[in-house]
């Protein structure tokens, strides 16, 4: 929620707003999606955040075995997925997961 609130919590700025913006941006060409290397070739990369292509300013945290935090500021929704998926390295898993989270955001977001 801290990132969705631009670094503020309960009216107090905890992290600089510009740092938050920079951390979820792919300003350098080599950080933008798509890129040639795996893993996650469909996603750009910020400061420990994976950034899907699109215009909704989404960003994701991806952990091992299919764990995700999906944040969509445009739809004002955060989706957290925990799990122990042994096939987490399956081809197109990231693309499918982002599509799934986008459907959730479209259905339940603002």
Placement of each model-derived feature along the sequence:
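Short, gly/Ser/Thr-rich active-site loops of penicillin-recognizing serine hydrolases
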Residues: 90-110
């Amino acid at each position: 929620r801290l990132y969705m609130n631009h670094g503020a919590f309960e009216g107090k700025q905890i992290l600089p707003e510009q740092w938050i913006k920079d951390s979820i941006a792919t300003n350098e060409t080599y950080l933008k999606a798509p890129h040639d290397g795996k893993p996650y070739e469909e996603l750009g990369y910020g400061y420990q955040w994976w950034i899907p292509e699109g215009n909704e300013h989404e960003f994701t945290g991806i952990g091992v075995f299919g764990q995700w935090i999906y944040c969509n500021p445009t739809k004002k929704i955060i989706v957290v997925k925990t799990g122990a998926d042994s096939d987490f390295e399956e081809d197109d898993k990231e693309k499918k997961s982002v599509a799934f989270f986008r459907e959730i955001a479209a259905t339940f977001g603002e």
